[in-house]
């Protein structure tokens, strides 16, 4: 006799439901919010998006639809946290606009399946807005650290 496959569709449904409620923006285990911000958004030397996005997608096991890399150091981006607070897109008041524009690359997903994700690159020179929070254990010892890239302007 072969295996009873009557429960197989139910198993697939449950797996699909679990995957759909798993947040795509969840911070990977063992990383602080600032460390995850660094992986997703700090890239001092520009790389082509297909290569650069590997480091992001390897944590999430999916092709992230869009991502922006700031071509600056974490330290320089963190200095924005010392500038006046502005309201974030989510209504919180812990966002800060950079003092000057920076070089950045916006990566837009064009096709493929993880791990073979393909992206289009768009080099730009713009201001950024970051959300900042007090550092967690393991973060650099700044009063506030960037934890979310809120907007590019």
Curated annotation (Swiss-Prot):
Q: Which GO terms describe its molecular function?
A: endonuclease activity; nucleic acid binding; RNA nuclease activity
UniProt enzyme class: hydrolase
Q: Which SMART domains match?
A: RNAse_Pc
| Positions marked as site (Critical for catalytic activity) | 64
Major subcellular location class: secreted
Q: Which residues are glycosylated?
A: 30, 58, 85
Residues reported in the UniProt entry to bind substrate? 64-68, 89
The positions flagged as active site in the entry are 41, 148
Into which family does the record put it? Belongs to the pancreatic ribonuclease family.
Listed under subunit, the entry gives:
Interacts (via N-terminus) with bacterial lipopolysaccharide (LPS).
Put simply, this protein is called Ribonuclease K3
Name the source organism: Sus scrofa (Pig)
Q: Which gene encodes it?
A: RNASE6
């Amino acid at each position: 006799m072969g295996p009873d496959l009557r429960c197989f569709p139910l198993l697939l449904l449950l797996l699909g439901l679990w995957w759909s409620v798993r947040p795509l923006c969840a911070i990977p285990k063992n990383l602080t919010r600032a460390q995850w911000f660094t992986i997703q958004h700090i890239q001092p030397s520009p790389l082509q998006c297909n290569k650069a996005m590997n480091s992001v997608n390897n944590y999430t096991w999916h092709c992230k639809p869009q991502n922006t890399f700031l071509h600056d150091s974490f330290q320089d981006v963190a200095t924005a946290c010392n500038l006046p607070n502005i309201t974030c897109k989510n209504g919180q008041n812990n966002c800060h606009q950079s003092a000057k524009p920076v070089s950045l690359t916006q990566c837009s997903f064009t096709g493929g399946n993880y791990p073979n994700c393909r992206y289009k690159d768009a080099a730009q020179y713009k201001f950024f807005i970051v959300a900042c929070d007090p550092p967690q254990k393991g973060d650099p010892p700044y009063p506030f650290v960037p934890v979310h890239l809120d907007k590019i302007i």
